Amino acid sequence: MGLFDRFTERAQKVMVYSQEEAVRQNYNYIGTEHILLGILREGEGIAAQVLKNKGIDLITVRQQVEALVGKGQQEVG
């Protein structure tokens, strides 16, 4: 049984997107900032809709995360 097998299909997508965001930023872990980006990338869940309704979008959050947290120091693959 995998770590995310008990998650809904949508939640599994969010985690995949979160991992992709973490790797894109050279991190070897998934932080809360990556989960937020994953939620926004998935785009169809209640959380994503609430964020969008408040004017919060993926591109802006991605830029803010990179400005606040920066990129990781190592290449992750």
PLM features per residue range, with description:
Residues 1-77:
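Histone-fold recognition with a strong bias for associated Lys/Arg-rich disordered tails
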